[in-house]
Regions:
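Hydrophobic alpha-helical segments
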Residues: 2-233
Length: 233
């Protein structure tokens, strides 16, 4: 009888000890599990943000590239103008579609103010640039001026600036910018900046060269600044 009671007592103590060990392990492991889950969610969010950032960067690059067909239209001969205008229209349609798709992507991933800027401020700025390009292209050759051409070019610069504003603030407002994926954020932003700065070097002096005039001091300074920024980037 005594042996049975002692055995039951030992079993009870072992059972209590096991419970204490299990509870202790839970207390030790739960914070680790929570931290691992939080790290996983941060990594998942960073992956989403990098994808969003890449899409916005593609849009900014395409807005920058729109200057090429726009410049072709503005500098074309009457014989080639109709062909270049059609190319520009097709390019603009693709950019407009990309703006809509990118705005929807931003909304789906929580970047609501950024999507609004894309759909409103950027659209308005881009329209101003395109209107200036079209106005210059519609002006008779004999009535054109370097000031009007430069105005159109500067307006297209402003459209890109508006798109780059979105890219910059998507990066700044991203959760993962302080994670191990932060390098990707910086690289995407710098490459976008580099591509546009390189394109502006020639565009800033294009109007004066087209009309065989002396390059204005401001345009020359801007072109040199673009060169320096592209070099440092």
């Amino acid at each position: 009888m005594m042996m049975k009671l002692r055995s039951e007592h030992i079993s009870q103590r072992l059972y209590i000890s096991m419970i204490i060990i299990i509870v202790s392990l839970l207390f030790i492991s739960v914070p680790s599990i929570v931290n691992s889950y939080q790290s996983y969610k941060r990594a998942e969010r960073a992956l989403i943000e990098v994808s969003v950032l890449r899409n916005v960067a593609e849009l900014t690059n395409n807005i920058s590239r729109e200057r090429a067909p726009a410049n072709q239209v503005m500098s074309s001969t009457p014989e080639k103008r109709a062909e270049y205008i059609q190319e520009l229209k097709r390019y603009r349609a693709n950019v407009d579609q990309q703006i809509e798709e990118t705005a929807q992507l931003l909304k789906r991933n929580g970047f609501i103010p950024h999507a609004y800027h894309l759909s409103h401020q950027l659209q308005a700025s881009l329209k101003e640039g395109r209107d200036a390009v079209d106005a210059y292209a519609a002006t008779p050759q004999s009535s054109r001026s370097s000031a009007q051409l430069d105005h159109a070019i500067q307006k297209m610069f402003a459209a890109w600036d508006s798109s780059q504003y979105v890219l910059k603030h998507v990066m700044l407002d991203s959760v993962g910018k302080d994670s191990r994926a932060s390098t990707y954020y910086s690289v995407i932003f710098i490459l976008s900046e580099l591509r546009d700065q390189a394109g502006r070097v020639a565009s800033n002096i294009m109007a004066a060269i087209t009309f065989g005039e002396k390059i204005p001091a401001e345009n020359l300074a801007n072109s040199l600044q673009n060169q320096r920024q592209a070099y440092h980037l």
